[in-house]
Amino acid sequence: CYPENAPRYISDILTCSMTMYFQSRHEAGEQLAVQLFEKYRYENTAVVALSDGAVAVGEPIAAKLHCVLTMLVSEDVAIPGEGQSLGAVSQEGTFTYSSELEASEIREYNTEFHGYFEEKKREAFHKINNLIGDGGIIDHDMLRERTVILISDGLSDITPLDVALDFLKPVKLARLVIAAPVASVDVVDRVHMVADELHILDVKANYLGTDHYYEQNDLPTHEQTIAKINQIILNWR
């Protein structure tokens, strides 16, 4: 079930099913929950979603593990005319450059588009603050000494993981697990060294866009997702 050009280690570290398409993100999350339950049902665990769609995947996982579900909100900053991400702003206001870019590329883009990028960063941070308020919906204390499971509904781009890893740098974790129903070979190749464990149901050589792999794409709005996460955290505390 792995692409022919996938690195050899993929078959050793990933649990892959023959499923290429999922009925919904919830159903994909249930499949991941079965895998994660076997290893982490007795662990002190936190599930951290990386997007709205990831919350839908993460809900059945958190329910199965009886653990908190939260979300790391970030806003992407794109490079004009390139169809590529420069990086993303986190809820703390920190900007993380995409690890797909070389240092020389970053310098070149910053020289050419400095004013544009600074404005987009301010807009991104303002948008995040409007959504989640000053307190945010995730903090370091919530994750310290826990097994943290980073959840995505589809890993086609490394940037959300770059932001998450940057956010987690000052936090002492028990383990770091990255899980997703589907991921591109390129992303898996980049992240397998930073996680203690990966759980990916399907690895794609030619990633067609996350929505393509789900029959149902009727997600709540960003505002509804944030409200849901806030309620989950309040109930958990």
Would you name each region that the model predicts?
Residues 1-237:
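PRPP-associated nucleotide enzymes
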